[in-house]
């Protein structure tokens, strides 16, 4: 198999490095910055390390490979696909690993499909420097199974989750709401606790509340409790915001929490559930699909 990368930055380099160690010999790349200092020197060094062969144009790259991985940025995903269109054929598998919205992946799929090439939306769910080519990947689209099959001999960790372009990226986007939100909560919380020298005590208190409870159960408890008590919690957050303002600590996450809780209170779920906590997460989500009439 001959594999090509459009874009040979950190992600492309990491994948190529791992694939070389796994025995893949025919790797090619084209990067629009390969002639532009200081990027050119880094790209050249990475190519030498991975044994990747440089292609001067996208046309040359696609003439040499069967599988091409678009490895640029989400903002460039569509334009790169459009640039590749004149040179894609039915013999190509086009894989987009860029971090982009499901709508962008759907657009890229539509562009690629018109050429007869097969498309796979691939969402990388871990750190490339840590995992290299074994980074967990979710794949969707018409070419997802083909992508999994052709990379299996090299140990890539690809899980096919559906045939619809955008599904894989949707999972990554929705997961990021939680993961980046959690980091933001740590930043805001610990910035404030540090002012009072109570870092360990606050973290210890949070740990007591969360440790020992399975994550899915934590999600159920928080959601079922939260929708019934959202209005009270929103008012409590007003005091939190006032405290942070007094300290001169940015309160962006606390304000967002208050607004989210107020929006949740607007569903009227406390009344709908008679003040009692619903027993399942599914009950909560169904009740929140549409506001009460």
Indicate residue ranges for each PLM-predicted region:
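Conserved beta-strand segments of alpha/beta enzyme cores
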Residues: 26, 53, 93, 118, ...
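Helical "substrate-binding/catalytic lid" subdomain
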Residues: 171-277
